[in-house]
Amino acid sequence: MMLTINAIPTDLSGIDPDTPLLWALRDHLGLVGTKYGCGIAQCGACTVWLNGAPVRSCQLTVGTLGDASITTIEGLAADGLHAVQRAWIEEDVAQCGYCQAGQIMAAAALLEKHPDPSDEQINVAMAGNICRCGTYVRIRKAIKSASSVLRSSVRFFDPGESELSVNPVDSDGVRS
């Protein structure tokens, strides 16, 4: 069985198909950023993206995934930190930090779907992610901050570069 995990084709044929994705990621592939919280898909610590949508990896078995694309916290940003990860640091969200990988994956998925989310959209998207330390105010602030950063950046292709570049723009749409 082949999956794409963090943009890398990955052969999982040696793993029992009834193994939860969470344990395949952690125990077999060494991707330990995704955390075990409750094991019943209620806390959100194990959140990863399945074909771009946030899901609980503790309840998905590898045998049910077909040729899916999985993104974990380790693969969220191609180079460096994702805007949500930077905002998490800048807003000092983490207290114990155990929930943050799942929280960040859920928040980044929200911003993919709703670049400028309302408080209600944030509440709905983040409802399945529990923070035992209660840093919900800082989580919301980080999501709003990341939203602002992502919306103030424009992607353009420079023929002299091999990849897309990101340049900030001001409120008038002028690249700085």
Tell where the protein language model's regions lie, with residue ranges.
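Signature of N-terminal electron-transfer/Fe-S-associated modules in redox systems
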Residues: M1-S176
